[in-house]
Amino acid sequence: MALKNFNPITPSLRELVQVDKTSLWKGRPLKSLTKGISKTGGRNNQGKITSWHRGGGHKKLYRIIDFKRNKIDVSAIVERIEYDPNRTAFIALIKYEDGEYSYILAPQKLSVGDRVISSQDADIKIGNCLPLKCIPIGTTLHNVEMKVGKGGQIARSAGTSVDLVGKDSGYAQIKLRSGEFRLVPLDCKATIGSISNPDQKNINLGKAGRNRWLGWRPHVRGVAMNPVDHPHGGGEGKTSGGRHPVTPWGFPTKGKKTRKNKRTSKFIVKKRK
């Protein structure tokens, strides 16, 4: 996929950079693999904001993605590659030999007409899904499970992947894009290849309105608020906040470690950079 630049005939086109999607499917998604998705506006079940700066956005249909790849030893052919508004990666519609359809995350270099399979005996080929114990060291992977049978959780975003760097004592050691080395059970599944749409990191929305279409509202700085709203608020004239950066609730921000899950720390061999 290439990037598209535009002639600056309007101010918002001057900086706009988009991913070229001309090779993707131009029709509607498969109806049996979609469902409605309601907007939350960043609110929880009590109506309180738990995710700031969310709201609005274009109406979407949710595409049901197969992260588990549980259809074992049944070959499938790639029918088409599609855009998915719910994620940065592209998705692939596959048709199994028994006639069943499914959506999977599309890896880079997967093309229409390619065959994919989920099997212990599968070839080490783009789009094939295998247990980690059956994959040679040095292979690039995506959609990696953390618990057996739970479905892929690691490396699902556009352009991401992990590297299998070792196996020992029932665990595989994988290297994440963050620099973290992590242990994953050898019976967990992973899919060969890197996720599609690696140019996602190079796009430029060009105007605030495009962020609104995506469901993002304006991000107001704390120093622009009143003292009642934020610890950085208030002051005569423009101020710098007068203290080290904090959240609206007074906790240090911009770099302070907040990870609490010590239960799984034993699976982290080396922390991220």
Swiss-Prot record:
Q: Can you provide one Gene Ontology molecular function annotated for this UniProt record?
A: rRNA binding
Give the source's domain of life in one word: Bacteria
Spans annotated as Disordered: 228-273
- What is one term from the GO cellular component aspect held by the record? large ribosomal subunit
Extract one GO BP annotation from the record: translation
Where is the sequence biased in composition, kind Basic residues?
254-273
Which InterPro entries did the record assign? NA-bd_OB-fold, Rib_uL2_dom2, Ribosomal_uL2, Ribosomal_uL2_bac/org-type, Ribosomal_uL2_C, Ribosomal_uL2_CS, Ribosomal_uL2_dom3, Ribosomal_uL2_RNA-bd_dom
Q: Any idea which UniProt keywords this protein has?
A: Ribonucleoprotein, Ribosomal protein, RNA-binding, rRNA-binding
Its biological purpose is as follows:
One of the primary rRNA binding proteins. Required for association of the 30S and 50S subunits to form the 70S ribosome, for tRNA binding and peptide bond formation. It has been suggested to have peptidyltransferase activity; this is somewhat controversial. Makes several contacts with the 16S rRNA in the 70S ribosome.
By sequence similarity, the record places it as follows:
Belongs to the universal ribosomal protein uL2 family.
Q: Tell me how this protein assembles.
A: Part of the 50S ribosomal subunit. Forms a bridge to the 30S subunit in the 70S ribosome.
Annotated NCBIfam families: rplB_bact (TIGR01171)
Q: What is this protein called?
A: Large ribosomal subunit protein uL2
